[in-house]
């Protein structure tokens, strides 16, 4: 687990440079994080789509890609011809866990659910088009959650979620803190009770041995609750990220529209059409006639100041 700290720190540090629009340094740091642990590549497609969605950064986007792929090739190429590197890294049995959850369609046709859900999330992120940095963080947090929660991942992988969960709690208050708190309790209790090698420093024995919690059914229920809490947090992160990505804040702030034109040009007709479209409960109409000193249909209107 402690070896996951280095790639996670490098990855989060790279994101800070994305926030500062220093894409060249970010590209190098992302390459370093992937070289430290290949699983960090999970978040890179979201970063690429984020940079691509900002039309004003084409040149910087190209620089990011050049430095990212160039640095990654520089770090990895010397080891490509090593049998030990191929066996321990490229053929690591931990990577096969993403294929453990599947639907058997018969005739040796399997639908692998973890890659499928990841691709659907990536497609959803791409279709939003205009993406802000908060939604980038949210989507990557959900992507890492998908890989971790839908595979029998070791405890160290959960370190990938710590920065995202910490940011989520700091921004969204009590509800987020409660969910992450319950998830943490379920996680610690599960590995304390059911994972070999777990030990308690306070008590002088390696694993708590309570017969009722050692049964497969209780263990499975415990694991289901832990994964369920993790998915609830992922849904909450994605929901808040989409809500904050509302570019013009149309869902939270009223919008003012000014309709101008000569008399008889159809201003009132257009206003009534908008009111019908959105509903009278959602529209407040302020007419210029409301600011006249005299009604337009009485003689004073034509022989005095109108306003």
Predicted regions and their residues:
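N-terminal intrinsically disordered, low-complexity segments enriched in P/E/S/T
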Residues: 96-101, 303-305
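Post-Walker A helix-loop "phosphate-sensing" segment adjacent to the P-loop in P-loop NTPases
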Residues: 275-285
């Amino acid at each position: 687990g402690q070896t996951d700290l280095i790639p996670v720190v490098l990855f989060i540090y790279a994101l800070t440079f994305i926030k500062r629009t220093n894409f060249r340094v970010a590209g190098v740091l992302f390459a370093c994080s992937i070289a430290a642990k290949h699983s960090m590549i999970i978040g890179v497609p979201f970063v690429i789509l984020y940079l691509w969605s900002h039309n004003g950064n084409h040149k910087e986007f190209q620089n990011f890609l050049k430095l990212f792929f160039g640095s990654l090739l520089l770090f990895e190429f010397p080891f490509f011809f090593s049998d030990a590197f191929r066996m321990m890294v490229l053929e690591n049995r931990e990577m096969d866990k993403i294929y453990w959850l599947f639907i058997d369609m018969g005739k040796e046709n399997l639908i692998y659910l973890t890659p499928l859900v990841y691709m659907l999330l990536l497609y959803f992120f791409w279709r939003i088009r205009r993406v802000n940095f908060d939604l980038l963080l949210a989507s990557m947090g959900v992507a890492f959650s998908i890989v971790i929660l839908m595979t029998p991942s070791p405890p160290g992988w959960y370190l990938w979620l710590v920065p995202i969960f910490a940011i989520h709690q700091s921004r969204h208050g009590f509800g987020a803190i409660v969910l992450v708190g319950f998830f943490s309790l379920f996680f610690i209790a599960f590995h304390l009770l059911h994972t070999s090698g777990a030990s308690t420093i306070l008590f002088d024995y390696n694993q708590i041995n309570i017969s009722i919690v050692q049964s497969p059914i209780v263990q499975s229920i415990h694991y289901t609750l832990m994964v369920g809490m993790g998915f609830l947090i992922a849904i909450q992160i994605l929901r808040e990220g989409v809500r904050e990505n509302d570019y013009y804040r149309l869902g939270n702030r009223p919008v003012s529209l000014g309709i101008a034109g000569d008399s008889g040009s159809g201003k009132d007709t257009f206003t009534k059409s908008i009111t019908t479209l959105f509903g009278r409960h959602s529209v407040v109409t302020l007419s210029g006639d409301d600011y006249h000193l005299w009604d337009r249909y009485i003689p004073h209107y034509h022989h005095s100041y109108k306003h």
